Amino acid sequence: MKKIPTVLLTFMMLVVLCTGCTSEKDGKAKQIDTPYVYPIQPGTEEWAKLDSLDAKIAACKVDPELMDSMTTEALLETVLDYPLLPNIYAFSSTEIGIGSVSGYFEGLQMLHDREDAAECIQKAIDTGTDDPLRMQYLQTLASYVRTRLGAPDF
């Protein structure tokens, strides 16, 4: 008789544990609300020592799992602060530039895929900034995420 409650209790605990694991994996909560701080920045002595694009890309690498767990606001700031973001303008079109930079910085595609990215970017635009380059980035990113909605702006 004592075995039945013990087996039943064990089974129920396993079900609860398995359900918890599935929920965490499938419905990842975006809980990190601070953007990534890049350890090496343009204009520093460390940056000047990086002698190739590959070296700069490696120095700016952000763990995709970290970005995936960020709120959209934190991810947007991480993208805006990306030291190689200006490279999106180094091509004949912004679309080609974003495609190129997305090849070595996953943050752009992650931002593009967020359901609330357009709203988050628009909020940042509406808030305004004294930095004209930041505003240009925001407007470019706004056009980029609109492609997720099927309305390319490039």
Feature locations, PLM:
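C-terminal motif of bacterial Sec signal peptides marking the signal peptidase cleavage site
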Residues: L17-G20
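Bacterial N-terminal signal peptides that target proteins for export
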Residues: M1-L8
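Bacterial signal peptide processing site
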Residues: T22-E24
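Repetitive helical segments and hydrophobic/amphipathic motifs
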Residues: F11-M12
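Non-catalytic all-alpha helical scaffold/repeat segments
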Residues: G27-K28, Y36-F154
